[in-house]
């Protein structure tokens, strides 16, 4: 009897994967925590405007729901699900200190199964758990960013001691670890008509119901609608990387100075626009970790992966998360790369058509003006044939690594 096994193909670091917090607009005490790569679509599902959603958000009396806060920057769906579970279960998560877990379950009984009852969610409690989770070592070195879309929720966060700088964004700090805090109170985060169409399909949080949707097209680009849902923010970085390998400009490793052969190793590239520094992955890691040990005054060898540092060539800041997103996209994300290139190609084709139409119009005008008479004969001048130049399409080979 033969058995077949399905091999799971590794994926690039996603363009966006978030853990979000919903709050009921009619009843602010009702909160919901979930994860998604597409916040606008997921919010529509929770509000009954699209199929999907979750059983706990299906009550009409609690709709519409507002997405008041989210955390972005997770390197994979699994990473986001782990963080989501810990935020939903701070009384069980080993990422939370034991004394804090004891406080959370103090006075609560047990279920018939013997398990501790889950403490009731409150905004203060969720913010406290969120602060602890983004600060622990298991999550604190990820390129996470905390977004706030309601001012009162941000105020609760501030009272906890992680104050953002003025100007709508900033960095909260806990010891040597930092998290970027972004505020955007420009518009409501619940779509109009929420809860009117119906309950949709009731489904518990399914990690697969959010994948690969079209970008949200909303005229009001605030809040969750302003989040980048694809790899467009690193398109120039990806294009630079492709050109380096296509024209064999990688040269020697920026750290160890050894020659690099395409296709025979994992090579990372400086993300700064004017810099083409390329190096072995382990060389970049050692270089940036040494900088961290000096800057943060920690013992060498305590960490495995860096967070950020300075490029040895251009001396600009490099973020490890950005470098790994480009690397994994170059190695594992052929489909995503082609999607990026198609958008670029369509824009070029549209410009070419407009250019061609202009040339044809000029040709017709010249043809009309080119008719003259010589004696009693009409002489027609033959217009020069217009040949529209075609631009060579670029090809980007991109991949990713975790």
From Swiss-Prot:
Its main location: nucleus. GO terms for cellular component: Slx1-Slx4 complex. Residues 351-380 have a biased composition (Basic and acidic residues). One of its GO terms (biological process) is double-strand break repair via homologous recombination. Residues 190-219, 344-391 are annotated as: Disordered. Its cofactor is a divalent metal cation. InterPro entries: GIY-YIG_endonuc, GIY-YIG_endonuc_sf, Slx1, SLX1_C, SLX1_endonuclease, Znf_RING/FYVE/PHD. Signal peptide: none annotated. It comes from Neurospora crassa (strain ATCC 24698 / 74-OR23-1A / CBS 708.71 / DSM 1257 / FGSC 987). The lineage of its organism: Eukaryota, Fungi, Dikarya, Ascomycota, Pezizomycotina. It is an enzyme of class 3 (hydrolase). CDD domains: GIY-YIG_SLX1. It is found in: Nucleus. Residues 201-217 have a biased composition (Acidic residues). The keyword Transmembrane helix does not apply. It comes from the Eukaryota. A zinc finger (SLX1-type) spans 253-314. Its EC number is 3.1.-.-. Catalytic subunit of the slx1-slx4 structure-specific endonuclease that resolves DNA secondary structures generated during DNA repair and recombination. Has endonuclease activity towards branched DNA substrates, introducing single-strand cuts in duplex DNA close to junctions with ss-DNA. This is Structure-specific endonuclease subunit slx1.
């Amino acid at each position: 009897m033969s058995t077949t096994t399905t091999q799971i193909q590794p994926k690039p670091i996603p363009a966006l994967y978030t853990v979000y917090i919903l709050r009921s607009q009619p009843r602010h005490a009702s909160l919901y925590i979930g994860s998604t790569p597409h916040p606008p679509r997921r919010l529509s599902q929770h509000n009954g405007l699209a199929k999907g959603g979750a059983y706990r958000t299906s009550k009409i009396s609690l709709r519409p729901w507002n997405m008041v806060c989210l955390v972005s920057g997770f390197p994979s769906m699994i990473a986001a699900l782990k963080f989501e579970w810990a935020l939903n279960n701070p009384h069980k998560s080993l990422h939370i200190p034991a004394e804090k877990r004891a406080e959370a379950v103090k006075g609560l009984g047990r279920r018939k199964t013997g398990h501790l009852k889950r403490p009731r969610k409150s905004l203060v409690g969720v913010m406290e758990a969120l602060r602890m989770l983004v600060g622990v070592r298991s999550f604190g070195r990820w390129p996470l960013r905390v977004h706030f879309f309601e001012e009162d929720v941000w105020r609760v966060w501030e009272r906890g001691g992680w104050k953002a700088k003025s100007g709508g964004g900033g960095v909260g700090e806990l010891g040597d670890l930092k998290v970027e805090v972004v505020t955007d109170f420009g518009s409501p985060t619940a779509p109009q008509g929420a809860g009117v169409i119906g309950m949709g399909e009731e489904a518990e949080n399914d990690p697969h119901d959010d994948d690969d949707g079209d970008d949200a097209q909303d005229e009001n680009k605030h809040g969750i609608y302003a989040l980048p849902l694809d790899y467009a923010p690193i398109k120039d970085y990806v294009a630079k990387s492709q050109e380096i390998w296509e024209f064999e400009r990688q040269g020697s490793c920026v750290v160890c100075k050894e020659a690099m052969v395409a296709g025979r190793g994992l090579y990372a590239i400086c993300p700064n626009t004017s810099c083409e520094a390329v190096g072995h992955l382990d060389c970049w890691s050692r270089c940036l970790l040494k900088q961290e040990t000096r800057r943060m005054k920690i013992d060498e060898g305590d960490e495995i992966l860096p967070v950020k540092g300075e490029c040895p060539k251009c001396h600009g800041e490099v973020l490890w998360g950005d470098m790994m997103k480009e690397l994994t996209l170059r190695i594992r994300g052929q489909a995503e790369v082609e999607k990026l290139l198609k958008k670029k190609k369509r824009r070029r084709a549209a410009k070419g058509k407009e250019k061609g139409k202009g040339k044809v119009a000029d040709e017709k005008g010249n043809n009309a003006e080119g008719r003259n008479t010589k004696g009693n004969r009409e002489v027609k001048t033959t217009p020069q044939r217009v040949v529209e130049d075609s631009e060579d399409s670029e090809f980007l080979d991109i991949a990713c690594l975790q």
